[in-house]
Amino acid sequence: MELQQFKYDNKIVKYFIIATVIFGLVGMLVGILIATQLFLPEANFGLQYTTFGRIRPLHTNAIIFAFVGNAMFAGVYYSMQRLLKTRMFSDFLSYLHFWGWQLIILAAAITLPLGLTTSKEYAELEWPIDIAITIIWVVFGINMIGTIIKRRERHMYVAIWFYIATFVTVAVLHLVNSFEIPVTMFKSYSWYAGVQDALVQWWYGHNAVAFFLTTPFLGIMYYFLPKAANRPVYSYKLSIIHFWSLIFIYIWAGPHHLLYTSLPNWAQSLGTVFSIMLIAPSWGGMLNGLLTLRGAWDRVREDPILKFMVVAVTAYGMSTLEGPLLSIKSVNAIAHYTDWIIAHVHVGGLGWNGFLIFGMLYWIIPRMWGTKLYSTKLANVHFWIGTLGIIVYALPMYTAGVVQSLMWKNFNADGFLEYPNFLETVTQIVPMYAMRAVGGLLYFSGAVMMSYNLIKTAKQGSFIPSEAAEAPALEKRKIMGGHWHSVLERKPVIFTSLVLVAILIGGVIEMVPTFLIKSNIPTIASVKPYTPLELHGRDIYIREGCNNCHSQMVRPFRSETERYGEYSKAGEFVYDHPFLWGSKRTGPDLHRVGAKYNNVWHFNHMLDPNSTSPGSIMPPYPWLFTQGIDTKLTAGKIKALRTVGVPYAEGYEDIANQDLKAQAQEIVNDLKAGDVEISEGAEIVALIAYLQRLGTDIKVQPTAQNQ
């Protein structure tokens, strides 16, 4: 059979690798900055653009989509060409994908510090950027599927299965979660409200972790680990079971992020059951990876690439065991809203994604530059300092999470909360926040070492932009018999269709009843839409990222109802576009804060948090007192919310600003009575109006004092 000559495109891989390293360092630096702000609030430099609430999503987006995302594309473009024995389908699409993705990252880097955010975790970017993401993701998909169709290898290797699942599922997740109604060029409201929005968001949020941070890297593991170890994958059959069970089960597990919330109990239970089931396929993948090293463990001692990959696969196993354990209600009751979750996320992010990326880069660079790694010794140092960084980061966070949760729940002998002041539970863990920053700095130092090592490696070699290869053409002939999955691997269109069906089942079964059966979200007659002033205040709350530190969900625990008041009901959130339940309590829950403190207290708290809450790690927000709300946007906001079902009367937008000014004047007069002067158009007035509204639509029980 005649061999065909062709060339692999290494240049596109190089571009994605350069972006990976640069954005990795930037994302880690932003992470160190926000970690520092938790024990040194002044580290925001007094600027509104560098506060924790605004740059925490910048850190998560930089790490997930810029660092891990670019690394994923580098690994996919490198391995796919070699596994399919063909160049990528279209060079034009490859480079359109690269530059489009970098422009999206640049847009995120500009808009998030400006406070242009939807507030939804891992989906904070506003609607024009969402559209750009959709277009570029389709470009990636066309290029990938086109490459599969023009392949010279009949069977699709296991790594390709995971790449297909990644493309299909992320596309579905992004489209469903990004339904929003635009107000301006950079302001929109989620199409969904309250409980429904929470379910869709965490269906997306959980599976973004599953299908952006997990499945593509399992594909990368299945390619690069056998290459680095010079051993075949341990079990083909195990990889089949691993793949199909993982993608089917994973999609159901999102509700475990919403245990003890206002989400219907049946949905919470589904999330718990499928999360526990996830242990089996996840550990199947981990064991398949580790057992691939059989006969090569002696090399792990000397080879830094294998070291990184072994720890990465082990971290994957630990994270995918801990995740299901955290979905058990009794465990979740302790861990949720605490730094335990931060530790869990970072063991996966730093250990699984980070270390696998490092191992991949150390393996690829010497081969694309036709040389050897500049310094194996320096790579080994990187491994040990990175491992130490993970330990120094994670252990204090696990400790902080358990300590703070137990303090929240502790009652004294008289039956009262032992620590009614939330700040008492914060000051105890501030030293652990400092240790967290040290751990992050160690990990970052290792990444700097790697960057130096890779640059020196490239300089001592010569880049091979187009790597020559040859393979026979794929014959068009009918093959009968064989293992059923072997037959499926020869039919990429059918394979992709089955993946789509597998991932849609769970989402449809969880979401459709929540949207269609009204009893899932009982209505409460006293719950009314936000006033125009409160609506502006809510948007300021979103802009400042307050939901990054404060929850708005009182769970049905005695410790929480004693501290905050009546537990939260599903019907209270029917006009919340988007929901703002939060996932972390660096500060207290705010769902029942309305009418708890007077207006002067809120005014002083935002101007100088320590004046009202000694020991607070919250920074001041002086710009709220000088910046004014834009009343020109009021009508557009009212119309947009009416479009998504909020019952504002037809034509109300024409008189909404009159109500806004009247309510603002009431607050200004009240502040003046407390010897505080402020303009009625100041942003702080709108924010106070919103905070005073929270939780007041239903009767609030007495709460702990001095919160």
What are the functions of these language-model segments?
Residues I334-A335, K409-A434, G482, D654, ...:
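Short, membrane-exposed interhelical loops at transmembrane-helix boundaries
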Residues E2-Y15, W297, R477-L488:
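Cytosolic juxtamembrane amphipathic/interface segments immediately preceding
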Residues V499, L504, N548, E562-E683:
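Electron-transfer interface patches adjacent to heme c in soluble/periplasmic c-type cytochromes
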Residues G46-L58, I63, A198-L199, G481-L488, ...:
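Sequence context of c-type cytochrome heme-c attachment sites
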Residues K518-I542, P556-F557, T586, K672-S679, ...:
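Electrostatic cytochrome c docking/interface patches
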Residues Q460-E470, L474-Y530, G651, Q658-Q665, ...:
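Post-cleavage N-terminal segment of exported redox proteins
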Residues K14-F45, Y49-L116, W127-I148, I160-M185, ...:
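Hydrophobic cores of alpha-helical transmembrane segments in multi-pass integral membrane proteins
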Residues G537, R543-Q552, H602, L687, ...:
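The canonical Cys-X-X-Cys-His
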